[in-house]
Amino acid sequence: MQIEKYYNDLNTLHINTEENRAYYMPCSDIENARKGTNDRKQVLNGEWNFMYYTCIDDVPEDFKDGNTDGFDKIPVPSCWQTQGYDRHQYTNTRYPFPYNPPYVPYDNPCGAYLTHFESDNDYRKYLNFEGVDSCFYVWVNGEFVGYSQVSHSTSEFDITDKVKNGDNILCVLVFKWCDGSYLEDQDKFRMSGIFRDVYILNRPQKHIRDYKIETDIQGKINIEIDSDTDVSFVLENEKGEIYSGDSKTITVEKPILWNAEYPYLYTLYLVTEDEVIREKIGFREIKIDDGIVFLNNKPIKMKGVNRHDSDPVTGYTISREQAEKDLKLMKQHNINALRTSHYPNAPWLMQLCDEYGFYVIAESDIEIHGTASFFGGSQAVTFGLLAQNPDWENAILDRVQRNVIRDKNRTSVCIWSLGNEGGYGVNFEKAGRWVKEYDSTRLTHYESSMWQMEGHINDTSMLDVESTMYADYKWIDKYFENPGEVVWHRVSLGKGSEYGGAGEWINLSESKLGKKEKEQMAVVKPYMQCEFIHAMGNGPGGIKEYIDRLYRYDGFFGAFAWEWCDHAIDMGDSKYFYGGDFGEYPNDGNFCVDGLVYPDRRPHTGLLEYKQAIKPFAIKSYSNIMVVENRYDFAELDDKLYFEVNGERMEFDVPPRGKKSFPRPNGDVVMVKAYQKSDTLWAKKGYEVGFEQLIVNDNVPKLEPVNADGSFEVSEQGRNITIKGNNFEYIFDKSTGNFKKLSDAVTRSVEWNVWRAPTDNDRNIMRDWINADYHREQSYVYDCTYDVTDTVTIKCHNALIPVVQRKHMDIETVWTIYANGIIDMQSSVKVGENLPVIPRFGLRFFTKGENVKYYGYGPYESYSDKHLCTYLDEFNTTVSDMYEPYIKPQENGSHFGTRYVETENIRVSSDTPFSFSA
């Protein structure tokens, strides 16, 4: 098929598309608008004719005329990879094609789509595609309509002159790649096709084209209208109509303000002679004062998450039900903010965020990460290639504009993000300035401004917030240590730092920078982490250190976990595939399996941990009182929650962001649980919001008292020391420094243990572990003696030394065996120098049975840096139930802070808390 190669043409981003506008659904009258029936919307979703081609050369010329010979059927919306065409590919930063901008490979797969639709009216007809990856050509009844790209934005065509009464043929040719694909290098499975809704809006000849609604906290609504017909307005609250008229400025007395805790919305109807548009709007105002982010004149904290459109069965295609399930789960786990990583979500999802109460960072459909992945490339040298190239100015600006203009009326959108990981340069600086000129009511963000390309001095004056990814919490301390004087200086080649980015800390008063650069750097901006606590596999850990700082520093206003869900493909039979499982190159393995929830939305323990870390209250114990902190920004604590303290209901009347003291009940352990006080969109009254366990006295049940009465029979033969008592028989192996028999409790010799299965987030340190041969440790015994009195005492000096390596550990242990069979172990360990951190250290027992009882942190897996979602208690469980089925097998199921553990055959206790797994 011969077509114009717009997919390789930077000067042709769109042909015959309508101007960008706000998202809305027109209705015929106010009653239909009130019901949300959208009777002017003709939905074209459904089963379409489809054929997949590996190259445009294979597409028949008469396709656009309606020839469907040999075509299959495909659901629209969908991704063609999820329907059995092409193959799946996951790549993080590397482009899936040669870097040769703006050109894409000649053999560029494409999908030919064809459907029929009926027309029986004289309305103007606007054909809408809410999401097509990557670019597409459109024909109606054999006539060319237009071309568009930008996968995650709406493209609208006026097809009025192409449509006839009766049956009409719509043909769409979608390409896998286009020049825009260089700007869509997001970390995700790469999928293609018409993946969002397709519909026609039937509209009168004269109608509203666009509008912009701005509110303030004094109750004023300002409306800008682009319309060729008269417009009037009706405003309603939950009780009914409060305004009707044609003024574009409406004032509401004592408005109820919108925030994430009380997402109150008014309903505004835009009424013309033949059409009505309904908008849900909230009164809210976001601003910065003295480096602090305020909403409605109150400082706020965004406790957020990054969310991709991802489903193991449907891919990018996400229904309202799927999206609403995500939002409900987020709110159930105390998440109040969302970053649309790294592209605009479906437009109706933003409306849901208004209703559920989320602070949204709306991100443009831009990521250019592949430019930093070249051989010899880096963030400082090649990351900004397209960001600096004037040929790409319009393409970058177009994507930013489409994001902002579409969602400009969404109350939940508080911050515009220019994109993600695209380097920095003049193209983003121009786009940022356009955003500030177009919309001064919201904040601007772009994390990649942290990177400075050689030969360029970044201008970040149009960016309102300072943003980093995965900065060490010590970096955050430094940022707030002496703001405005000791500052982070972006430099092209970087010198290494605790953040790891290209820059260094400098004292402005002592630096030799130019006046303009100094003035810009002296501006103290609010700080956020647009990505933190990488949730891959058994993680994230160390959340508390970040959340402590979120509340310690007024200027630290937000942190967004990476990321919401595991990306994987459901292959049936409980199998999930990830990168490389489809034989694709390049691929980045299981790096996409990095969510707080499994692909099917079962919560990981990491989500439970995050829920506890960001719960809307904190309680500390001092002497005989409890200090209760309300971490809501707007709500009185007793308006949202009721508490049970050791099972007794209580309410704490603490003001927003306030603290108050209350008497603490008696007891060694005080358990405080918080419950939702009323029904919400995401949970019923009585839903548990979080808990706090106060350990007053750590009185743990001990092992039975040592009984010295009784007799021993001790013998030595070769390497074995055999100890027999009334009801036990132990054999100690002098060659390993450990027991090889403990009656029937173990099935093989006890082992010294250093190695464990690496977690996904161990991917870097794991190389050092393997190079150090931690998985090959052998015990070498220097000396082993024993003595018999009323006990048996074995003293052993041994070392752990792998083949090839020098000594890793020197161990001296005293074992004392009592007449009742209890074994006491005292061990001192000296670790060798210049070794990587040890995965773990302890003893490995090979026991029988399933049942386990322990006193420690449970019931979920727990670790020294990941146990907020667990509490100290005695638990009865099984080995199977302690297993956490991560998609890629790894370390799991450990229990931190254990005082004792008991299987069917053995019991271990310690004066010092320990961890165990089974």
Language model region names:
Residues 222-224, 327-330, 337-598:
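Substrate-binding/catalytic cleft of secreted carbohydrate-active enzymes
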Residues 5, 11-14, 18, 34-35, ...:
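Accessory beta-strand-rich segments of carbohydrate-active enzymes
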Residues 82, 87-89, 94-103, 149, ...:
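An acidic-aromatic loop/edge-strand motif
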Residues 78, 82-118, 123-129, 133-140, ...:
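Active-site-adjacent substrate/metal-binding segments within catalytic domains
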Residues 161-167, 226-289, 668-716:
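Extended acidic/polar, glycine-enriched regions
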Residues 1-125, 178-187, 191-194, 589-602, ...:
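Extended carbohydrate-recognition surfaces in non-catalytic/accessory domains of CAZymes
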